[in-house]
Amino acid sequence: MSPAGCSHVNGFKVDNWKQNLRVIYQCFVWSGSAETRKRKAKSCICHMCGAHLNRLHSCLHCVFFGCFSKKHIHEHAKNKRHNLAIDLLYGGIYCFVCQDYIYDKDMEQIAKEEQRKAWKLQGIGEKYSMWEPTKRELELLRHNPKRRKITANCTIGLRGLINLGNTCFMNCIVQALTHTPLLRDFFLSDRHKCEMQSNSCLVCEMSQLFQEFYSGHRSPHIPFRLLHLVWTHARHLAGYEQQDAHEFLIAALDVLHRHCKDDNGKKANNPNHCNCIIDQIFTGGLQSDVTCQVCHGVSTTIDPFWDISLDLPGSSTPFWPLSPGSDGSVVNGDSHPSGATTLTDCLRRFTRPEHLGSSAKIKCSGCHSYQESTKQLTMKRLPIVACFHLKRFEHSAKLRRKITTYVSFPLELDMTPFMASSKESRMNGQYQQPVDSLNNDNKYSLFAVVNHQGTLESGHYTTFIRQHKDQWFKCDDAIITKASIKDVLDSEGYLLFYHKQFLEYE
C-alpha cells in the first residue's frame, strides 16, 4: 500500500463523497446487520462474468462490481476512466493510475468508523484499536526527540542467550521463534491479554522475551524464567540432560497454544477451531486419503499439524526413488535417488501414495469388508510458517543413531505440487509439474535453520536466522556471528523454518 494519498483521490472528493463512501462500507464491505449481509450476498457479483469470488472490487465513481483477479474491474476503470475502486473483502482503496492500494486519512477514518459500527451490531468487541498518544505521552515524545531508525544494516533483534547447562536445544528454538515475523509483530504490539497469573503464563514470558530481544541491548540474555516455565508446564523436559530441539519446539507451541485465548475470548483448547496467534501462524491441515483397491472408494480425513516430519535416505524406512537415476533403473524399489537428496525429494516421498498391504487391511465403507488400500498424504491447508523436521535421529529396539545424510534445501520453496488440490497432477505416484505452479499463495522463504552438531549421545544445537532479506547470522548460544547464504545452505539442517511470501489479512 502506498504510504501517502495520491492526487487522484481529489477527483472523488466532491459533493456527498463521505456519505457515498459510508454507504459502500455499510452495505458492501463490513455489512454489520443481517439485512446488509443478505444485500451483499445478492448484489456483489461481477457485472462482467457473474462470479462472486475473484477479489471483487466496487467502483467508487459509479455502480459497478468487477473481478480484480480476472481484471474486469481494470477494464471498467480503463473504459470509463474511473480511477478508484474499493476491495469488498478488506476495504482497501485501489488507484488504477498509481497501480497500488493507496492511503487517505479521511477515507481511512470513515472505514474504521463503519467497521466499529459493524462489529457493534454483530456483538463483536473491537479487535485492536489504533494507538492514540495521551497528553502525557505527547509530552514525553516532545522531550525525547531522538528516534532509533531501522536500516538495512541494523542489528536490533540480534541477541545471544546464555546456556544454562545443556539448554542449547531451547536457545536455538527461541532464536527461531523471536525471528518469526508475524510472531514478533504480535508480541511487540502488546496484543496478549493475560487472564492467568503472569508468573505462570508462558505467553507473558515470551512477550517479555521479545521486548528483551528488540530493546537494543547487546549483552546476552539469561532465559532462566523461560526455562523454569517450560519445566513447570512440560515435565518431560525438566532437568539438565540433553533434550531434542524438535521435541522442545512442539512442547513450547503446545503450552503457548494452551495459554493463549483467541479474539472471541474462547479458550484455545481445540486445534481445529482456534484463533490464537499460535494456530494462526503455525497450524496447517494435513489431508489423508485412503483408497480401497477393490471399489476405489476414498475415505478422507484432515488433521491439524504444527510441523512436517520427513524421512531421510539412510534410515531404516525405505526411501523410494522419486526421480530417475542416470540409467533410469530401480533396484527392488528401494534404491536412493542419484546425486544429492533435496527437501523436494523428501516432500515428494511424504506425499506419495503408499500401499498399505495385506497386513494392514482397512474396513471399506463401500465394500463393507476389510480390503487392501493405498494411503496418500497431501496438504489441505498450508500454515503461514511451515516447519520441516528432518528425521536425523533414529530410535528402534535394535538401533540408535544419527543420520548425517546431506539434504539440499532452497531459499525459496513452492508447496503447490504437494497440495490436495494438485493431487490429480501426480498420476500413480509420478510427479508432474502442476499447471497452477505460479500460485503465489503457496510460496515460502527460508528464515531460520536449526542444526545439530555431534552424535546422538553428545551434541550441540545452533541456529541460522535471517535478519533482513539477505542478511544471515549464526546463533551459537551467547555468540552471534555474521553468516553467508552459502553457510546456511551448506549446513546439515535439522529444523527448517519457512515463512509465506504473500499473506491475506483478515
Swiss-Prot record:
It is found in: Nucleus. One of its GO terms (cellular component) is nucleus. Zn(2+) 1 binds at C6, H8, C95, C98. Component of some SAGA transcription coactivator-HAT complexes. This is Ubiquitin carboxyl-terminal hydrolase 22. The active site is at C168 (nucleophile), H460 (proton acceptor). Coiled coil: none annotated. CDD domains: Peptidase_C19D (cd02660). Its EC number is 3.4.19.12. Keywords: Activator, Cell cycle, Chromatin regulator, Hydrolase, Metal-binding, Nucleus, Protease, Thiol protease, Transcription, Transcription regulation, Ubl conjugation pathway, Zinc, Zinc-finger. Histone deubiquitinating component of the transcription regulatory histone acetylation (HAT) complex SAGA. Catalyzes the deubiquitination of both histones H2A and H2B, thereby acting as a coactivator. Recruited to specific gene promoters by activators, where it is required for transcription. It catalyses: Thiol-dependent hydrolysis of ester, thioester, amide, peptide and isopeptide bonds formed by the C-terminal Gly of ubiquitin (a 76-residue protein attached to proteins as an intracellular targeting signal). It comes from Danio rerio. Belongs to the peptidase C19 family. UBP8 subfamily. Zn(2+) 2 binds at C46, C49, C67, H72. Residues 159-501 form the USP domain. PANTHER family: UBIQUITIN CARBOXYL-TERMINAL HYDROLASE, UBIQUITIN CARBOXYL-TERMINAL HYDROLASE 22. One of its GO terms (biological process) is chromatin organization. A zinc finger (UBP-type) spans 4-121. Pfam families: UCH, zf-UBP. One of its GO terms (molecular function) is cysteine-type deubiquitinase activity. It is an enzyme of class 3 (hydrolase).
